[in-house]
Amino acid sequence: MYRRSVAEQSLNAHTMYNPKFQTFSVKNQSTHFEFYILCKGLNSGKPLETPCPNSFVCICKNQDEKDFYFWLLFGLWKAKYFHQLLTGSVIPFIRIDEFKKEVAIQAEQVSKQHEAYTNTINQIKLLEQKEKQILHNLALIKDVKKAMIYRHIKRKI
């Protein structure tokens, strides 16, 4: 009898992810392990935490699977990978079958380097936090500049 090595088992555990992708509908029940993906416009493929019209929903079995696919799609979206799948002349969109196929291909590639991928995702999460913090600080600086100018402006009441 053939026994699998621990490395083979962990690799297979990561490639076993198989989320369900479908067109978002308000009528469908939501789960704790789902996120949404824009499917129309130049931001097609962008993962979102909250639903919106013109989106797909990715339904996962657990939090690990959700994180895996959310950040995979985030990376593909940032790299403009989905632009090659866009169809339509006025409002470009992605067909769900093409989307599923490409996501499956990319998930398989990434799962072959699971540890390196996980490290990259952790670094991206930190960078996202820093970016939000910097944007918040820039908004505060903008408000302070306005306040400094308003001190010198005569107001009509």
Residue ranges of predicted features:
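DNA target-recognition domains and sequence-specific DNA-contacting regions of bacterial/archaeal
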Residues: M1-A107
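Amphipathic alpha-helical segments
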Residues: Y69, K100-Y150
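Hydrophobic/aromatic-lined pockets within catalytic cores
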Residues: I153
